[in-house]
């Protein structure tokens, strides 16, 4: 393969959501300023995470690797991002709304007093897993912050970031409350952290 063919080569890899988040945070991925502003609302974000939970495809991300350093966004939804100052630069060309939604929900981002933090109703998800497919489709185990405040349910609800960053304290607390829920938590945590992959 000659040099110009190498420059045009298209490659892909399947990576975990946690890897995408880490690469954004540490500056390996950047969103160039020529991308449109973030326009999704909380329901779009919840629907994206619901698709991930159900293992539906959410499309691939197009990342452009180049030696050229371009102007980039230094924060996403008020989440400060590190800058990669050396080596190759990787810019998100397609998938910016989805990537922003993923990191915004996990990090509990806020913009203009709007919270993008999501919560996972593990009790509801566990009950849904025992029902038929039609019942599962019409329900979502994800809640926005407002929906959580408006809810009078005593279900076990966890911030989304706790599913991606396994916390044994949460597992121990759940196991004291309900063994089935704690076992299901392990399954769901693994599903979000390792089983679901996206092509970049």
Model region roles, listed by residue range:
Residues 2-39, 46-200:
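Basic- and aromatic-enriched surface patches that contact anionic nucleotides/nucleic acids
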């Amino acid at each position: 393969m000659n040099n110009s063919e190498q420059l045009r080569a298209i490659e892909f890899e399947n990576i975990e959501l946690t890897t995408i988040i880490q690469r954004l945070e540490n500056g390996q991925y950047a969103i160039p300023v020529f991308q449109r502003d973030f326009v999704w609302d909380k329901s779009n974000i919840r629907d994206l995470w619901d698709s991930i939970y159900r293992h539906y495809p959410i499309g691939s991300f197009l990342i452009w690797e180049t030696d050229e350093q371009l102007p980039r966004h230094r924060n996403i939804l008020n989440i400060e991002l590190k800058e990669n100052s050396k080596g190759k630069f990787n810019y998100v060309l397609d998938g910016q709304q989805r990537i922003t939604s993923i990191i915004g929900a996990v990090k509990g981002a806020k913009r203009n007093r709007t919270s993008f933090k999501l919560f996972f109703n593990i009790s509801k998800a566990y009950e849904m897993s025992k029902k038929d497919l039609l019942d599962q489709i019409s329900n979502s185990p994800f809640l926005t912050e407002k929906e959580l405040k408006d809810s009078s349910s005593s279900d076990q609800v966890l911030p989304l970031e706790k599913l991606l960053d396994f916390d044994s304290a949460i597992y121990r607390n759940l196991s004291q409350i309900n063994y089935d829920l704690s076992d299901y938590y392990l399954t769901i945590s693994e599903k979000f952290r390792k089983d679901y992959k996206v092509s970049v």
